[in-house]
Amino acid sequence: MFWKENLQLIMNFEDFDQAYEWFTPRHDPMPFPKMTKAQLRNAVKLFKEDQGARIAYVAEYLSSTSGKDFPTLDDLEQLLRLGRKSMDRTGPEFDDISGTFFSLANDFAFCLCAFLQKYRDDVDWVASKTSKKSGAYNRPLIARPNYETSKGYIDGLQFFLNSLRSSVRREETVDEVMDELKFAIKRNFDIDLS
């Protein structure tokens, strides 16, 4: 049974939200594109340092049944479902003013990075070196070595934020967002999850 019927429809989301400890990034509080290269490299360094502890918290908090295999594809889906539930409270134009949505985006990105590292040991957080024309310019990316402007990386934070916003506007399901994620993973990392 998938996570006990989706954690009894996300464990009554308000109960989840009250107990969930937000992730607070330790990097400078400014948008990534406005950071200097040194500031972005520091943000990436801090993400790498924080990933293990945050993944352990998420696995325990969500009572994942995947055990030492956490995070699995089902775990990533669960985080997307929580993000969607969070967004449904306010609508895509407002995001989630509580901060839960943005914390879940970070947790999703950490878990996505760890998930990909199980398949490829050359995947890690990197400071973007894509061009200014790229939507991933000057951002922390989950990437393989020698990635290109258009291929070889995923912006885990932006994937979570943009895909869920778009899914609400287009009235798509989380299952469809998962299909997008699998496609992006196959295209960028040559990992077939179908």
What are these regions (language model features)?
Residues 1-98, 187-194:
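The feature captures two recurrent sequence modes
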Residues 15, 40, 118, 152-153:
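Short linear sequence motifs
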Residues 47, 58-62, 125, 142, ...:
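Generic hydrophobic, helix-prone segments enriched in Leu/Val/Ile
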Residues 81-84, 113, 117, 165:
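Alpha-helical repeat scaffolds in large eukaryotic proteins
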Residues 98-148:
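Amphipathic, interaction-prone secondary-structure segments
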Residues 130-194:
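A recognition module on extended beta-rich or small alphabeta surfaces enriched in W/G with H and D/E
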